[in-house]
Amino acid sequence: MIKNTIAIVNDSEVTTGSLPDGIISINAWEVDWDNLSLDDTYIILGGHMGSYDDKKFTYLQKEKQWLKKAINSDTKILGICLGSQLIADAVGGTAFLSDKIEFGFKDLNFVEEDPLFDDFKNSKVFSWHRDTFEIPPGATLIAKTEYPQIYKIKNTTALQFHPEIKLELFEAWYDSELSKQELESYDVKSEVNYLKDNFKQLEKSMINFYSKWISANSL
């Protein structure tokens, strides 16, 4: 059976970026969560909200309920940024607001070896988040910075950073006055220049990772 790869869009400004073509994007606030198939492959994208903002963004409640069911059914899932936080919340971890923003390109500190992520050893990864999480029971932490960055649980892979980053995405996220205010103490220009200068390597690392992830046998 041929499976679809479906990206769940939690925020209209946080799209698939430099992920490969052929991914079907659907908006989380329009999903019929009660009838969403467990047999396809899913990418849970990021967003400006927190996992705990589910009273304001009520679709997050149903999304987390579906994620719990899907993870326990060994549905193949990749969570990115908010996606990694929703996954943690769904299966016994805790997503929460940290005391500061993590912004910019960072080196990962690997605490477990897993060849799936080897390409992220060769380049920095981009983070922009204030929310973080405690990984859920039964999960394996693979890499971290000051915060957890990669973990796996069952057939689910979670990344706090943004492997899909590209200049157009960054510009969309940075466009608001709120974003400019929260980053006023950071050297944003330097990070943008790094993105421009290293995009080919960043994209290569992401594509190599994605190819290994999408082709890996499900549990």
Question: Which sequence ranges carry the predicted segments?
Answer:
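Glycine-rich, phosphate-binding/catalytic loops in enzymes
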Residues: I23, T58-K62, A95-F96, A143, ...
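Hydrophobic/aromatic beta-strand patches that form the interior of the parallel beta-sheet core
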Residues: I6-A7, I24-I26, I43, L78, ...
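Cysteine-nucleophile active-site neighborhood
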Residues: L45-E112
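A short acidic, often aromatic-flanked loop/helix-cap motif at beta-alpha or helix-coil junctions
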Residues: E30-N35, F103-F105, F133-E134, P148-I150
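Amide-donor transfer/coupling interface in amidating biosynthetic enzymes
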Residues: V111-L219
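Short, solvent-exposed loop/turn segments at secondary-structure junctions
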Residues: S12-E13, H48-G50, Q85-L86, Y147-Q149, ...
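N-terminal beta1-alpha1 cap of cysteine-dependent amidohydrolase-like domains
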Residues: M1-S73, Q181-L219
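Short glycine-/acidic-enriched loop or helix-start segments at secondary-structure transitions
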Residues: G17-S18, D53-K55, I87-A90, P137, ...
